[in-house]
C-alpha cells in the first residue's frame, strides 16, 4: 500500500459520519517519509454549519474507533477555521495545506 493509499473504507466511513467538504492526508504519509508503523493523519474539513459534536475529538474518535484500530487519526475542523488558519505559520491547518494532499472533495 503506497503512502497516499488509505486503508479500504476509510473515506466512506468519514463521509458517512461527518459529511466533510474535503479530507486531507498530512504528516509522514503525505510527505512520503513514513515508516511501516506510521499512522494516517487526516483532517476533515466540515461545513461551517457542522454541529459542535462533529468537532469534538473524543466524540469523533469514539465514533470512528474502527479506524483508530487501523491507525487512522481524523482531526475535524470547520471550513471557515481551516480557511482562516491555513495561512498562519504554526497552525496545524497551515501545515496541512502546505504539505498535505486532498484525498476526498465534493
Where are these regions (language model features)?
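Catalytic core of pol beta-like nucleotidyltransferases
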Residues: 1-22, 30-36, 47-106
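Short beta-strand->loop micro-motif that forms the acidic, two-metal-ion catalytic signature
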Residues: 41-45
